[in-house]
Regions:
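Extended, non-catalytic subsegments within catalytic or DNA/protein-binding/adaptor domains
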Residues: 1-336
């Protein structure tokens, strides 16, 4: 268990379980430490980091307004959520901030604010935010289709470490329908090269917070060629354990640090602009949605699409299928 997790999860277990003599026997001490370790694993590391960041933001917001963050009054929490909505934060982000506040209260032995809110000010505020955001038009990032991505890959010219890496990132991002968080979390050990292409182990994802892990197949490919492009990157990267994709410095040289999810988004937008696409309407998620759109157009079955995308809700995949078939056998096709 790392130091951050120990601090976040280190409740006064000894004080609660100490015998009358206030001396913890060695066996009980070991069992207490085991319980702490299991609690530390109850949340994915990325979730704990996000909760810690959200909690620090809430603390700062409270201090500026001379409010007490712990234990927080329900009215203070509701007002904080409203301030996030006013700042343009997404409903999912606001919900995560609330979960972070509740989690930190529980770790400190306090009752979460929403569980001592007889007037339901938190629940009602959150419901109002969600109702307003549903009514507000949202513009999703456009899918990048295979033909456009092939042009983007071609625009990553040269044999510099950055160019070779960028080609591999783009090809693999679409071929494996990866979220940007999954792309940057990949380790070299998660990759297995096989005759047909490669097997990729996704250890944690948005829909796999317990870290059960999922293995997906990525064919070598004939258009985007994710297999050969990844092999080219590996010949530059080397076989040292660590992140699959390293960050490059200002001179384009390779470091040993992992890429950030934001750098992946910027990479996609940079090459999109190079081939004439609007960078404002594309992002890292455009690769994932591009795979699903292309798979739907090609007539792939929902189970096969789900194998790669790992989405639990079939309704999301059905949306891609409907979008891909909008103009097929159109009712007005023979007379318009």
């Amino acid at each position: 268990m790392d130091d951050d997790s120990s601090k976040a999860l280190g409740l006064s277990d000894e004080a609660a379980l100490a015998p009358l003599g206030n001396v913890i026997p060695p066996q009980l001490a070991a069992e207490i430490e085991a319980a702490r370790s299991y609690r530390a694993r109850s949340k994915a590391a990325n979730t704990v980091r996000a909760y810690d960041s959200d909690w620090r933001q809430f603390e700062e917001w409270c201090w500026v307004r001379d409010l007490e963050p712990m234990p927080a009054m329900p009215e203070a929490v509701a007002t904080y959520l409203a301030s996030l909505a006013q700042a343009g934060r997404a409903d999912s982000t606001i919900g995560r901030h609330l979960a972070a506040i509740a989690w930190h209260h529980r770790q400190a032995g306090q009752v979460a604010p929403q569980h001592r809110d007889p007037r339901d000010v938190i629940a009602d505020t959150l419901a109002g935010i969600r109702r307003e955001q549903r009514a507000r038009p949202t513009r999703k990032k456009s899918a990048i289709l295979a033909a456009d991505l092939a042009r983007m890959i071609a625009a990553a010219e040269g044999q510099s470490p950055r160019a070779i890496r960028d080609r591999a990132v783009m090809a693999l991002g679409l071929a494996a329908a990866l979220r940007r968080s999954e792309l940057v979390a990949l380790q070299l050990a998660d990759l297995e090269l096989v005759r047909e292409g490669l097997k990729l182990t996704i250890r944690h994802s948005k829909t796999d917070q317990e870290g059960a892990g999922q293995v997906i197949a990525v064919p070598s490919g004939k258009v985007l060629k994710p297999g050969p492009r990844l092999n080219e990157w590996l010949s530059v990267r080397g076989g040292e354990a660590g992140p699959l994709f390293y960050r490059t410095d200002a001179q384009g040289m390779m470091t040993k640090e992992p890429m950030s999810d934001r750098s992946v988004a910027r990479l996609i937008q940079r090459y999109a602009e190079k081939v004439g696409l609007d960078p404002a309407v594309v992002g890292a998620h455009s690769l994932r949605s591009g795979f699903l759109t292309e798979a739907a157009k090609a007539g792939a079955s929902l189970p096969k699409m789900q194998e790669v995308s790992r989405q639990k809700k079939v309704e999301v995949l059905l949306g891609y299928v409907r979008d891909a078939a909008l103009f097929e056998n159109h009712a007005g096709e023979r007379f318009l």
